[in-house]
């Protein structure tokens, strides 16, 4: 074989080896790109989820703020009504001697006993009780 043929065979061998090296590198880069795309997709999903959570949180915060404003207004109105009641009671106490005596008198024993709760040793000893926040039922019914 001539030298030219040997050089061509060596060059062809190097070209084939280079081709296999480039093919391997291409496969490696493709796998790396797929992993990066998967990570980016996961991050995009996380970003979307966080944006939705932020939107929900902001909506709730707005609703809570409006509810707080309404409750503050109700509290202010209740305080005004309570102050007006106190003024009325004070005025009536100053104007009416009978009302002043009634207001200052002790409650009758029967009424006082309604507000007292006997101690219970266990649950079976206690009758069903009404919570303090609920009014007592009318005894005449």
From Swiss-Prot:
Location within or outside the cell: Host cell inner membrane
The keyword Repeat is annotated on this UniProt entry: no
Membrane spanning stretches: 1-17
Topological relation to the membrane, as annotated: Single-pass type II membrane protein
First-listed, main subcellular location of the protein, grouped into a coarse class: host cell
Origin: domain of life: Viruses
GO biological process, one term: killing of cells of another organism
InterPro entries (alphabetical): Phage_P2_LysB (IPR020000)
Periplasmic side: 18-141
Keyword terms: Coiled coil, Cytolysis, Host cell inner membrane, Host cell lysis by virus, Host cell membrane, Host membrane, Membrane, Signal-anchor, Transmembrane, Transmembrane helix, Viral release from host cell
Span list, region Disordered: 119-141
GO cellular component: host cell plasma membrane; membrane
NCBIfam families registered for this protein in UniProt: phage_LysB (TIGR03495)
Purpose of the protein: Component of the spanin complex that disrupts the host outer membrane and participates in cell lysis during virus exit. The spanin complex conducts the final step in host lysis by disrupting the outer membrane after holin and endolysin action have permeabilized the inner membrane and degraded the host peptidoglycans. Host outer membrane disruption is possibly due to local fusion between the inner and outer membrane performed by the spanin complex.
Subunit structure: Interacts (via C-terminus) with the spanin outer lipoprotein subunit (via C-terminus). Part of the spanin complex which spans the entire periplasmic space. The spanin complex is composed of spanin inner membrane subunit and spanin outer membrane subunit.
Name used for this protein in its record: Probable spanin, inner membrane subunit
Source organism phylogeny: Viruses, Duplodnaviria, Heunggongvirae, Uroviricota, Caudoviricetes
Name of the encoding gene: lysB
């Amino acid at each position: 074989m001539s030298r030219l043929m040997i050089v061509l065979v060596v060059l062809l061998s190097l070209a084939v080896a280079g081709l296999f090296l480039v093919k391997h590198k291409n496969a490696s880069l493709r796998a790396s790109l797929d992993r990066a795309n998967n990570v980016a997709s996961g991050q995009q999903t996380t970003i979307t989820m966080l944006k939705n959570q932020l939107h929900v949180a902001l909506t709730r915060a707005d609703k809570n703020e409006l509810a707080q404003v309404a409750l503050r207004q109700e509290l202010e109105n209740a305080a005004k009504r309570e102050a007006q009641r106190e003024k009325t009671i004070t005025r009536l106490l100053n104007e009416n001697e009978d009302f002043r005596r009634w207001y200052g008198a002790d409650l009758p024993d029967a009424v006082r006993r309604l507000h007292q709760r006997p101690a219970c040793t266990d649950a079976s000893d206690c009758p069903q009780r009404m919570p303090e926040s609920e009014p007592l039922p009318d005894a005449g019914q």
